[in-house]
């Protein structure tokens, strides 16, 4: 059920009044009112609370109202708990919001825990809150916290292999809320918990402070963390520059979580924290020193919802609170409060649905643990302690010319992983410094003895170095000669005569791997090739007795330059299980082609588009794993990148191992399609936006483009709806490519059904097709990512292969069963159609393969009827109206004759022919059966209405005759069961010489009916019949309800 109608009252410390009798959801705020230097100040957070309340009002039937009063003492550890008690006594709130300052948060959190009252804050960053013991059981931190910063730092140390020591410097005035102390505390505890030697010192602003800092750094660590105002960092770096500590042996991490140093200020530009109002010499020294500085900040959410939220936040702050806020990372805290309120409402709703109440604070808080949901600040992940996982950014001087700081890495707290942007960190010595170099700190080590070497030792050392240099030179010369020999031998070359074509059944039945370009299942139909076909096939041949795949190159000749020779050598050298093996190339004009390993299962695109193949997620993850392994190897090889990765370039061998093909040999590649062809745009559906736009690429540009292509393939595998599936949109490949190329927010990407897919898989897709190539992970990171959430992927290679083969066998068995059922269904339909065309006995003879002989019948009764005035009626009606009329009439007739022992022979226009007494003989019952049927049809016609002429009466004329006939099947194409003999002609004359709405019968039929004595007949007289002369005929008037006769 939904929440009941609620009144949300924001009671700010004192003065709020709960309306009598109202069922209120009361939210109490304990935040500072005026000090905007706090990110959690009420003028910053208040607009976010108002926006959250409005969002709740749209989602739930809520009656909302604010009650506010003066806010003071919210960052005082003495006044804040008193205000909290007042709030509890006077307003009995359901949720406390704040405080953000650490010391008052500790006091208020203890009270809240005692009251079992949820306390939600996006501040209170201290590590002491991480252990939610009995003092802080109801504290929920939906914003960043110092322990999460520590986790990021530990991950950084692991990446750079810093395992020994670190030094921490921070400012701690002890007269404020100690923000620098509590921020660096998380780093200290995390590093200490990782068994590092961590020393820390408080920076003093008194004279000699910078010298004391550099002395502390020299003595305690090469990896230095500094937390304090930017002026403090400048002072330390200037002194470090003077003492040559910025020579690359040290690295300085500046903990500026809100990124204030990167924002533009009175004396500095955006992204230039080294700029300051100093002398030119000091400014140059600072700029050089900052090359050794890495800045750590929170990560601004990249999702469009956050940008929209921030814009609305600034407007509401100006209109409702009279303050001008600037776009900055401080607004992230307001967004965290917003997401926290919505999280509380969601969990409260669930609690009430489960039979709980708003007063059950502990239960509500416990349900928040481990939550994952998407808020305005992106993906919100709460850990088991109800602390939010936090994302960070590592900034470095990415442009040495301008000195601009740029993101070097992003850290995902939810994934515990660093995603490197591809921008290299400008290490002064080209590599990260060592955290514990030999003899830097442990001077007691005997190996650190710096006694000068003797003359004999120097001579021996020089001789040894000379021999080593001579050996290395000889080896390099030998290797150079062997390389030239290998290039000249052209081991890759295949003569056209060596390739065998023709009847492939002799070697390999079914050769011809289907490398489809069909886009069946997508929203824009099938891709047609230049030849008008819906798929293209991989050409195959035979080389040295083995089936090989042959890719023809649309070039007249290949110039064997040194570059081309090296490309071909590299293709032979690259060997890996998940890359198709390069066998060789033919350069004999006009038969220029590339010869590679043949994979008989076809392409990945074939498999995904084949609905008869059931792919469970174990199988899909196995294919994804193969693809990632292949691309990781390719990116680390001499070839470096693929450049044209798509599902049709991923093939599957006989053991269901996915292999990547069509890589390398850039000199052989060519585009045969015209620039505006449909096929060309369809191939570009996997192409990264930076390649489509044609902008210059960074060093790793093609590798990051491959990652984008991998994301599109990942979406294909996940949804099996074709590349770039767009739910509800019908766009051509050209339109899709143009939208991707434009690069406008929100970026145009395929549709994803988050409810059906693993959330981590969706996140991986989104990271891989990020607009900024630097934000995409590399395949090494992707491999680790997939290994984590593919729990079943740890089986052995043999087990994996057996599972794949078993699934393939199951698919085949299911396919055979489906095809059998389809065959039986089609057989049933064919037999039903045959029984409608021919009599059942005749159809059975044909099914048994027997010849149907013509058969004579001594006595049958034939019925003929047509519509009087049908020609005139047809002339006055449209063809569709005539068809509708006949269909309605004969549907009515067919339903009636099913009640009698008769057989419908045929209908020709408005003529209707029925017989009784054949093909199944029924003795003397044929005449009364036809008579009763004729009376029933005549009765039906009297009430029949013509749709387009409802006031007209349909006039049916009926003729009946009894006599001998011969019946048989005539013709091979569309065979018909026909009647022959004078009886047929006479019956037709009886109908044509009859009258409308009357049944005209012959004397023979009258004699047959008289034997029963229950039919009323009236003599018509002698009637002149064409070709028959005069015949005595009768009108059948009806059937008497007397005692039954023989029938």
Curated annotation (Swiss-Prot):
- Topological domains annotated Extracellular: 17-458
Cytoplasmic domain ranges by topology: 479-1047
GO function terms (MF aspect): ATP binding; GTP binding; guanylate cyclase activity; hormone binding; identical protein binding; natriuretic peptide receptor activity; peptide hormone binding; protein kinase activity
Membrane topology field? Single-pass type I membrane protein
Keywords, sorted A to Z: Cell membrane, cGMP biosynthesis, Disulfide bond, Glycoprotein, GTP-binding, Lyase, Membrane, Nucleotide-binding, Osteogenesis, Phosphoprotein, Receptor, Signal, Transmembrane, Transmembrane helix
Supply the EC number(s). Answer: 4.6.1.2
PROSITE patterns, from UniProt?
ANF_RECEPTORS, GUANYLATE_CYCLASE_1, GUANYLATE_CYCLASE_2, PROTEIN_KINASE_DOM
Q: Which residue spans traverse the membrane? A: 459-478
Q: How is it modified after translation?
A: Phosphorylated. Phosphorylation of the protein kinase-like domain is required for full activation by CNP. Glycosylated.
What's the superkingdom here?
Eukaryota
The record's family statement is: Belongs to the adenylyl cyclase class-4/guanylyl cyclase family.
What protein am I looking at? Atrial natriuretic peptide receptor 2
Q: Which organism is it from?
A: Rattus norvegicus (Rat)
């Amino acid at each position: 059920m939904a929440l009941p109608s609620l009144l949300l009252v924001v009671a700010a410390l004192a003065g709020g009044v709960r309306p009598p009798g109202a069922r209120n959801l009361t939210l109490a705020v304990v935040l500072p009112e005026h000090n905007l230097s706090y990110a959690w100040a009420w003028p910053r957070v208040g607009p976010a609370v108002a926006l959250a309340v409005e969002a709740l009002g749209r989602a739930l039937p809520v009656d909302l109202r604010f009650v506010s009063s003066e806010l003071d003492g919210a960052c005082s550890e003495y006044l804040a708990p008193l205000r909290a008690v007042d709030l509890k006594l006077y307003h009995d709130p359901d949720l406390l919001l704040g405080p953000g300052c650490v010391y008052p948060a500790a006091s208020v959190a203890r009270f809240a825990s005692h009251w079992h009252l949820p306390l939600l804050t996006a501040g209170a960053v201290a590590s002491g809150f991480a252990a939610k013991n009995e003092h802080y059981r109801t504290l929920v931190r939906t914003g960043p916290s110092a322990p999460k910063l520590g986790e990021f730092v530990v991950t950084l140390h692991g990446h750079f292999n810093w395992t020994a020591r670190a030094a921490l410097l921070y400012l701690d005035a002890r007269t404020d809320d100690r923000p620098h102390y509590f921020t660096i505390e998380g780093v200290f505890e995390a590093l200490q918990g990782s068994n590092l030697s961590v020393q820390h010192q408080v920076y003093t602003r008194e004279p000699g402070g910078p010298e004391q800092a550099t002395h502390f750094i020299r003595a305690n660590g090469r990896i230095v963390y500094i937390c304090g105002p930017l002026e403090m960092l400048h002072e330390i770096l200037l002194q470090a520059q003077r003492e040559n500590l910025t020579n690359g042996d040290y690295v300085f991490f500046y903990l500026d979580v809100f990124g204030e140093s990167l924002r533009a200020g009175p004396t500095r530009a955006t992204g230039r924290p080294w700029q300051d109002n100093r002398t030119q010499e000091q400014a140059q020294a600072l700029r050089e020193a900052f090359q050794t500085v890495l800045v750590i900040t929170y990560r601004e959410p990249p999702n469009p919802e956050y940008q929209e939220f921030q814009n609305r936040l600034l407007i509401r702050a100006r209109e409702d609170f009279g303050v001008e806020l600037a776009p900055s990372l401080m607004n992230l805290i307001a967004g965290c409060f917003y997401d926290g309120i919505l999280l509380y409402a969601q969990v409260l709703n669930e609690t009430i649905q489960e039979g709980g109440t708003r007063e059950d604070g502990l239960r509500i808080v416990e349900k928040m643990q481990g939550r994952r949901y998407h808020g305005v600040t992106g993906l919100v992940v709460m850990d088991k302690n109800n602390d939010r996982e936090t994302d960070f950014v590592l900034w470095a001087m990415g442009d040495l010319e301008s000195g601009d700081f740029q993101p070097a890495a992003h850290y995902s707290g939810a994934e515990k992983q660093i995603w490197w942007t591809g921008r290299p960190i400008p290490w002064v010595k080209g590599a990260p410094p060592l955290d514990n170099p030999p003899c830097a700190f442990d001077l007691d080590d005997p190996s650190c003895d710096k006694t000068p070497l003797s003359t004999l030792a120097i001579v021996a050392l020089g001789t040894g170095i000379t021999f080593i240099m001579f050996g290395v030179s000889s080896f390099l010369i030998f290797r150079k000669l062997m390389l030239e020999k290998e290039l000249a031998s052209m081991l890759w070359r295949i003569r056209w005569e060596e390739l065998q074509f023709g009847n492939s059944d002799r070697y390999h039945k079914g050769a011809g791997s289907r490398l489809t370009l069909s886009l069946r299942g997508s929203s824009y139909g099938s891709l047609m090739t230049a030849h008008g076909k819906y798929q293209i096939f991989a050409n195959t041949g035979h080389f040295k007795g083995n089936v090989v795949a042959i890719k023809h190159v649309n070039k007249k000749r290949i110039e064997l330059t040194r570059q081309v020779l090296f490309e071909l050598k590299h293709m032979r050298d690259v060997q890996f299980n998940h890359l198709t093996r390069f066998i060789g190339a033919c350069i004999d004009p006009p038969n220029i082609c590339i010869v590679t390993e043949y994979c008989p299962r076809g392409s990945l695109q074939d498999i995904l588009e084949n609905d008869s193949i059931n792919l469970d997620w174990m199988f899909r993850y196995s294919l994804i794993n193969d693809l990632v392994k292949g691309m990781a190897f390719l990116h680390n090889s001499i070839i470096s990148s693929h450049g044209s990765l798509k599902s049709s370039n991923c093939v599957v061998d006989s053991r269901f191992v996915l292999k990547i093909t069509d890589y390398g040999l850039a000199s052989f590649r060519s585009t045969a399609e015209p620039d505006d062809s449909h096929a060309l745009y369809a191939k570009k559906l996997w192409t990264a936006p930076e390649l489509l736009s044609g902008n210059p690429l960074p060093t790793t540009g093609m590798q990051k483009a491959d990652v984008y292509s991998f994301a599109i393939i990942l979406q294909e595998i996940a949804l099996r709806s074709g590349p770039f599936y767009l739910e509800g949109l019908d766009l051509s490949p050209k339109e899709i490519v143009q939208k991707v190329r434009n690069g406008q927010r929100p970026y145009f990407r395929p549709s994803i059904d988050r409810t059906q897919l693993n959330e981590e898989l969706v996140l991986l897709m989104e990271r891989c097709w990020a607009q900024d190539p630097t934000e995409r992970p590399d395949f090494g990171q992707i491999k680790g990512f997939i290994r984590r959430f593919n729990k079943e992927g740890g089986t052995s290679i043999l087990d994996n292969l057996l599972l794949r083969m078993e699934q393939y066998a199951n698919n085949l068995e299911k396919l055979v069963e489906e095809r059998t059922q389809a065959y039986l269904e089609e057989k049933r339909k064919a037999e039903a159609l045959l029984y409608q065309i021919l009599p059942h006995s005749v159809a059975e003879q044909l099914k048994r393969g027997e010849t149907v002989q013509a058969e004579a019948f001594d006595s049958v009764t034939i019925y003929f009827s047509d519509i009087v005035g049908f020609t005139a009626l047809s002339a006055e009606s449209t063809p569709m109206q005539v068809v509708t009329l006949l269909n309605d009439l004969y549907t009515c007739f067919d339903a009636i004759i099913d009640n009698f022992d008769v057989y419908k022979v045929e209908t020709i226009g408005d003529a209707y022919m029925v017989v009784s007494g054949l093909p199944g003989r029924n003795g003397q019952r044929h005449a009364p059966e036809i008579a009763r049927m004729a009376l029933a049809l005549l009765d039906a016609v009297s009430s029949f209405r013509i749709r387009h002429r409802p006031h007209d009466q349909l006039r049916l004329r009926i003729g009946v005759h009894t006599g001998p006939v011969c019946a048989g099947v005539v013709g091979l194409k569309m065979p018909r069961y026909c009647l022959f003999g004078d009886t047929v002609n006479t019956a037709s004359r009886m109908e044509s010489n009859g009258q409308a709405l009357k049944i005209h019968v012959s004397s023979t039929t009258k004699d047959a009916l008289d034997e029963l004595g229950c039919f009323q007949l009236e003599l018509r007289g002698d009637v002149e019949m064409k070709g028959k002369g005069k015949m005595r005929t009768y009108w059948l008037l009806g059937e008497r309800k007397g005692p039954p006769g023989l029938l």
